[in-house]
Amino acid sequence: MSAKDFLVELGTEELPPKALNSLGEAFLSGIEKGLKAAGLSYAAARFYAAPRRLAVLVEQLAVQQPDRTVNLDGPPLQAAFDASGNPTQAALGFAKKCGVDLQQIDKSGPKLRFSQTIAGQPAAGLLPGIVEASLNELPIPKRMRWAARREEFVRPTQWLVMLFGDDVVECEILAQKAGRESRGHRFHNPDNVRISSPAAYLEDLRGAHVLADFAERRELIAKRVAELAAEQQGSAIVPPSLLDEVTALVEWPVPLVCSFEERFLEVPQEALITTMQDNQKYFCLLDANGKLLPRFITVANVESKAPENIVSGNEKVVRPRLTDAEFFFKQDKKQPLESFNERLRNVVFQAQLGTVFEKAQRVSGLAAYIAERIGGNAQNASRAGILSKCDLATEMVGEFPEMQGIAGYYYATHGGEAEDVALALNEQYMPRGAGAELPSTLTGAAVAVADKLDTLVGIFGIGMLPTGSKDPYALRRAALGVLRILIEKQLDLDLVAAVNAAVEQYGDKVKAAGLAEQVLDFVFDRLRARYEDEGVDVAVYQSVRALKPSSPLDFDQRVQAVQAFRQLPEAEALAAANKRVSNILAKSEDEVPPNVDASLLVEAAEKALGSAVANAESEVAPLAAARDYRAALARLAALREPVDTFFADVMVNVDDAAVRANRYALLAKLRGSFLGVADISLLG
């Protein structure tokens, strides 16, 4: 079957830059979905997206649907004809439904059947509907109307190109009649651009100063920005989201180096970077030591004969923003950081839980408690907690919310606070996302954990639990943050005690009954998802969770040990044996003695197991106490042979009550040895 290339380009006013790439991907996905549903084969398809256009190119698209055969089954033969062989109403009705005479119906099978070959339709007639359906399904939160039209789209449409091979596909979509005339660059080539063929689309537009390929523009910008940064003896900060947004803002990217006065470098560089990236879409430059250079790169959408004018224009635009940051920084430094705490008495943390000032007091107390238990400095942790929210009341954070914590660090340093106290003011918000940086200091870790536990306890304490996708207080992220800090920083904290301490601090603001257990279950349940992401079987998690370790670090060490144990050849048999032992003990009506009476061990197999368990117990106990769980389970793996022999040769539930109880005691000792690490009966 013959095939042709197909191109559709919808021209619009400037599309939302943050959504441009996703709109292009969705446009392509919708068209591919429509082509597959129509049975139209093709070799490849790709999308193109620029500020004023969305396009899809389909290579080697079939010019027509394949013919298809439709089989319709009717009533069974015995219901289709009476005893005399005359057609019944059922047979006549089926023939009428098929639109044919009964003579054309197949009667060779158990049922009447009508087969019909339907000729495939030309692709050109199907393409407008496929394109329109894809456009209607684009993920656009709010569509708009324009002029006096009833059509709706994310932005007013301006033109429509639709070519199948060399021919225009005649149609009208979103108030635009299809043709082959596109538009060039708004300034360099404002006239119409004739698209000679789908395959020539990119080159035809390139000649009109438009790079329609999003990926090509993105790569060009990234490469040129890196080159310009190197020329300035620096490196550029290129967040992927910023690169995507800048790519979506320009059709003909021309990166240019600009500068600002060095005096602004006295302002925290994070504030300067924030305003230049977020407000101006500039790429900032760092020196070899990670310090901000007084230069930045802007990406113009025009190849100017006088680029210095564009440079000076951007320098003029950025100066007031940097001046504002400088002013806020100087104003805030005029008073001690702690003095900002008074303003927080009037800032509500949560209506039922009090003010941010009160939260800082709680964080201070809990941070000191935690620091004492993880080997930190309780006094510094308490001080950091008191100062932890002060910067929220500063001018700097009021203007640049992203500076919370960072501003606190700079103001604390300026005020002569201890280095770990200053760092903790920023580290309290760590980790800021999945896989993000963790606190570098014990003081920072203590404050970060305290802040998150305080939020968890408070919000749970007033019954505002996260539901489904709704988690307004980011409690899931807080729980994962606590776990990451304690596990990855190897901090051994009794979380049960810490949560209870947090509950006590709230007093009557929360419903304390059962609150600690609820919070702890929520936190430890987050570990399940963490381990699943790491490829750890849920049974491994459950085997440790059954013991309810109170320290996340201890929990993780047990999980890693069980994960290693599962790889041993003895693991499966011992897991099954432990499950059998668990069931036997659960069904026992006798009281299980605490110790094994060697004189009641009768059979050779139970004597061997008794000796093996006793020896293992003496070796495993110190290993478990030292939390060398991997070695403990490896030692217990040696019990497989005597355990297998015991169950093969010994009947547990004998008539002699004393012997039976003693065998229960032996099995309880066996199970207890494993329970020092995990309940491996759950691994089966």
Swiss-Prot record:
Question: Per its UniProt record, what HAMAP family does this chain match?
Answer: Gly_tRNA_synth_beta (MF_00255)
Upper classification of the source organism reads:
Bacteria, Pseudomonadati, Pseudomonadota, Gammaproteobacteria, Pseudomonadales
UniProt subcellular location: Cytoplasm
Its chief place of residence is cytoplasm
What name has this protein been given in UniProt?
Glycine--tRNA ligase beta subunit
Tell me the gene name: glyS
- InterPro entries listed in its UniProt record: DALR_anticod-bd (IPR008909), Gly-tRNA-synth_bsu (IPR015944), Gly-tRNA-synth_heterodimer (IPR006194)
**Which NCBIfam families does UniProt cross-reference here?**
glyS
Q: Which family does it belong to?
A: Belongs to the class-II aminoacyl-tRNA synthetase family.
Origin species, per record, is: Pseudomonas aeruginosa (strain LESB58)
> Mind telling me which residue stretches traverse the membrane in this protein?
none
Q: What residue ranges carry the coiled-coil annotation?
A: none
CC per GO annotation: cytosol
Pfam families the UniProt entry points to: DALR_1, tRNA_synt_2f
Give the highest taxon in the source lineage.
Answer: Bacteria
Instruction: Drop me one GO molecular function for this one.
Output: arginine-tRNA ligase activity
Give a yes or no for keyword Aminoacyl-tRNA synthetase in this entry: yes
